[in-house]
UniProtKB/Swiss-Prot annotation:
Protein name: Scavenger receptor cysteine-rich domain-containing protein SCART1
Presence of keyword Glycoprotein: yes
GO terms for cellular component: brush border; cytoplasm; plasma membrane
Gene name tied to this protein: SCART1
Localization per record: Membrane
Segments in the Cytoplasmic topological domain: 928-1027
Domain SRCR: 28-128, 135-227, 232-326, 328-428, 434-534, 555-656, 661-761, 786-886
Lineage, top ranks: Eukaryota, Metazoa, Chordata, Craniata, Vertebrata
Primary site of residence: membrane
Amino acid sequence: MRAALWTLGLGPLLLNLWAVPIGGPGALRLAYRHSTCDGVVLVRHHGAWGYVCNQEWTLAEASVVCRQLGCGPAVGAPKYVPLPGEMAQPWLHNVSCRGNESSLWECSLGSWCQSPCPHAWVVVALCSNGTFRELRLVKGRSPCAGLPEIRNVNGVDRLCVLHVEEAMVFCRELGCGPVLQAPRRDVGVVRKYLACRGTEPTIRSCRLDNNFRSGCDLRLDAEVVCSGHTEARLVGGEHPCAGRLEVTWGTVCDAALDLATAHVVCRELQCGAVVSTPEGARFGRGSGPVWTEAFRCAGNESLLFHCPRGRGSQCGHGHDAGLRCSEFRMVNGSSSCEGRVEFQVQGSWAPLCATHWDIADATVLCHQLNCGNAVAAPGGGHFGDGDAAIWPDAFHCEGTESYLWNCPVSTLGAPACAPGNTASAVCSGLAHALRLREGQSRCDGRVEVSLDGVWGRVLDDAWDLRGAGVVCRQLGCRGAQQAYDAPAPSRGSVQVALSRVRCLGTETRLTQCNVSATLQEPAGTSRDAGVVCSGEVGTASPMARRHGIPGALTLSLHREPQGAAGRGAGALHGGAWGTVCDDAWDLRDAHVVCRQLGCGRALSALGAAHFGAGAGRIWLDELGCQGHESALWQCPSAGWGRHDWRHKEDAGVFCSESVALRLRGGTCCCAGWLDVFYNGTWGAMCSNALKDLSLSIICKQLGCGVWGVGLAGEQALPLCGHRDRLGGQHRVPQAAQLHSVAMPFPPMAPALLRPSRAGLSEDRPQAAGEPLNCSSWLGCPEEGALRVRGGEDRCSGRVELWHAGSWGTVCDDGWDLADAEVVCRQLGCGRAVAALGAAAFGPGSGPVWLDEVGCRGSEASLWGCPAERWGRGDRAHEEDAGVRCWEPGPGPPLPAAPFRTFWVVSVVLGSLLGLLLLGLMAFLILPRVTQAMQRGLGRSEVSPGEAIYDVIGEMPPAGLYEEIMEAEAVLQDEEDGSVVKVDTEAAVSGEVSNLLEGQSIRAEGGHSRPVSQGYDEAAFPLEEMTL
């Protein structure tokens, strides 16, 4: 009957009718993912669950599944590769839905059978109520570049080893245009987390390979860059915040760069505010493509990527746009060229202390901000106090530097700034500033002019007295006495700005003359224009008078070139620095100098050029201070410039706040143990305080470059790097530029100096092997210390960092297994098991110190990873990041906490059960073996010491089996002559047992022995005996 129905073709029909289930929620579920609302589609049939096998699976079918399960709309319909331990049997084949059905059973269902299903046809549904949250590229310079990942509620799936097909779908779904860069196919492993054809509308429709979910090698991560990515940089400037503007990586036409766009670029590069936008390829001609689109920024965007674009203009590289930004600014004045001096610290503006601020520092700042020359440097909060805390950094400029960060900066030993004592500057406001170099005063020397903030030479061709007169007038000096040809500086050290200058003599500025602007030095020998003015105008400038500033008189202490712990007194008068003669120089004069400079009290007054002979003018002689004056020029003296001595008698002073540095015990002059001279004594410095900004300042102050590496403990040897290693950059490096010592700007605090043991001095240097252990002395964690809290042990919990005197947390934005790997390594806790977010170990307290951490996984510490600036976290503590590490030990790594107790109990119970089974087997088998051995006594023809070697599992030797089976074994007891009959099958069992043990036992003396009462005469068939 069955065969007949099958022959008629009714068999499959009846089978399908019999297999159709009664539809219902209990017959459908999603499995093998993070929640019940996303995962593999499973259906139940005859009490067993199986896959749905579809060659074509779209959002229409996935939408029906999500609707039936009450999980919201479908957001993805990918394919799936099962894990090795997951079920592999399919039940339902070829489902087709329109998308509006209320349950899967209303769709067109194919066959119900267990026919083989290709792995690529196993289907998945991702619903909106599931754990999937967002798709993004992280750790790049814009949302259209970075490492691809899928962020879920319970963590992040890093999508490593993707190729161009997957990158195409990624870029398309993010709205970032076509893919520009993707990992090569010959890089990394063959298998991938997901596989796309490149035509899918969403990455959720690509095929998932769940075998590879936890096998991502973070070292093989490669960045995906889409065409929508825009990244700005400045090239060819004198510091990292100035140069030719290039955007990924083409130049921009100068006509297309407006002030709003410039503000966004400066903000993106963390370079403060816009100073100027020089045109005409001021920073050199670029190469490669030129942007034909123009950025239409509003000015408040955080990235250039967010600015809309419009139609731009066509230009060549002769019109490449330039941009100059500055981390310094002047505020609260009548213009941007006067006001309170502020600079950017950790994204905020802070005023600078006026204690050490002088006209030389103001000169550099005015030039840096393209504001001409400095007119005055008033202190005492002349332009208001501001709302932020006053920053105590002290700049020691000569006045000729092109950028304020090029000046020596000191922070060690700086006393707290008095409230309201903020630094200020008043600049001339001329965009084209002028100065005279290498002369005896500010009114004679070689002419240099600043065009758009860049100092340049003025060549001597066509130079005459009329041009010199214009220069003297512009500088506020008296009439020109001489126009001469000055020796040019070394070729290439200063670029040429003007040539063929022809003036009428009536102009107010040199740039109003008939000039030729050029950046090229002509071939052959060229000399510069020089001028000598008849003298300085004795009155203050109009701008200085407007602000009630009596004049530009400044005092400073100049170090000798070797960096000894002391200062020579010097004064700035009439724009030129000069020294003080030691005639009648005593401690009362020194007290006035130390008080005026905010350096405490005078420890000693030194003469005879103790700190080396100075240069330039000798301004003061025969000083007669009483010690209570507020400024040195209030003391009686012989008058300005009146003296009868040379620089071999320059005066010097030691103040109680004097700080000097030296390196000793190293292999070169720029490596060694760091000693600090403070309050008249040499002492060691704790390595706790050696962060990258301090190291940079130390190396610059010692003339050893602009960056350093500090090694703590017994290897605390700061190693300084010279400028040529950083491509000529002179500023303090930012965290994103030097990852090897990448720490944010630390908060300013009194220097952590430890007094030397038994008065450390130059005569008794500390041994190079002595460690500087300051932990007990400091009584607080080291800056940047790391810990975990709220976990089960010391290797799991919420990640916390010590910074600025308090513990803070890390935001889980961008937090993944690579970041956790660095934390676990830094804690000495082995490998990372999980990177957790959403305050998995409870919310922390205090500030959120780090956000968007971007570790690669190979860094030695968390502060070596790129991240948002310290304290810039934009989340509350409900998104605190955590880690779970596996500390290497005798056992395998433990899983997450919810499963740990289960596995421990399972192992213990399994071990007890195994021991119980072994004991039971011994109890049952051992008596039988013993009795069988007793029964077989006397049957062997070999001695006890001989062994019978045979192959286990083969039959007994020929004849033995038949001999035993033909007759009963008879054992004669010599004492009573009784005969005992033995079951032949039991005897066979005993003989075989003896043979399997490799020996035969002979009965001794031929005596019969009684049979044990425990023998049950059970036979063991040969075919069932196995080892």
